[in-house]
C-alpha cells in the first residue's frame, strides 16, 4: 500500500476545500445530514461491501476517468494521498485508524463517503450516472432519503 500522510496546513486546506465544494457542514454528511447538492446517491453499505465486483467496478470507473491518486480524509482527522488501487471506501476498513472516511481527487468533481450508519454515498454527476447505468438494481439499494 502506497500511502502518504498529508500534514498540518495542507491537510486543513484540502479538507476545507472538500467541505466547501460538497456542502459538508457537520461531522456527518449525506444522507445523515442535509446537503444542497443534487448529484448524490447513498446506498446501503452492504450492497457494495458484500459484492466484490462492485468495489472493482468503482476502481475501474475512476481509473477510466484518469484518476490515479486520491485524497483520503479519515474521521480521526488524518489526511492521506493514496493510489486509486488502495481505495477501500468502507467504514472501518483501516482498523484502529478507521471509521468514517471521505475520498476524492484533487479536482473534487466526485466524492465517496462511508458513514458509521451503514451507508456509502457517491457524489458527482458523472460518477452517479455511471453507477446507475451499470448497477441496474440500484433503486432497490438506496438508503434513507437518497435523492436520486
Task: Please place each PLM-identified region on the residue numbering.
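Structured alpha/beta or helical-core interaction and ligand-binding surfaces enriched in interleaved
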Residues: 1-148
Amino acid at each position: 500500500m502506497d500511502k502518504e500522510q498529508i500534514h498540518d496546513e495542507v491537510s486543513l486546506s484540502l479538507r476545507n476545500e472538500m467541505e466547501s465544494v460538497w456542502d459538508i457542514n457537520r461531522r456527518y454528511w449525506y444522507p445523515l445530514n442535509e446537503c444542497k447538492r443534487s448529484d448524490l446517491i447513498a446506498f446501503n453499505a452492504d450492497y457494495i461491501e458484500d459484492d466484490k465486483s462492485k468495489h472493482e467496478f468503482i476502481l475501474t470507473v475512476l481509473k477510466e476517468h484518469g484518476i490515479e491518486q486520491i485524497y483520503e480524509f479519515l474521521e480521526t482527522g488524518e489526511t492521506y494521498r493514496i493510489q486509486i488501487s488502495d481505495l477501500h471506501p468502507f467504514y472501518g476498513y483501516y482498523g484502529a485508524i478507521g471509521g468514517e472516511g471521505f475520498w476524492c481527487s484533487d479536482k473534487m468533481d466526485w466524492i465517496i463517503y462511508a458513514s458509521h450508519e451503514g451507508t456509502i454515498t457517491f457524489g458527482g454527476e458523472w460518477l452517479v450516472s455511471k453507477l446507475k447505468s451499470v448497477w441496474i438494481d440500484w433503486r432497490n439499494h438506496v438508503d434513507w432519503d437518497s435523492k436520486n
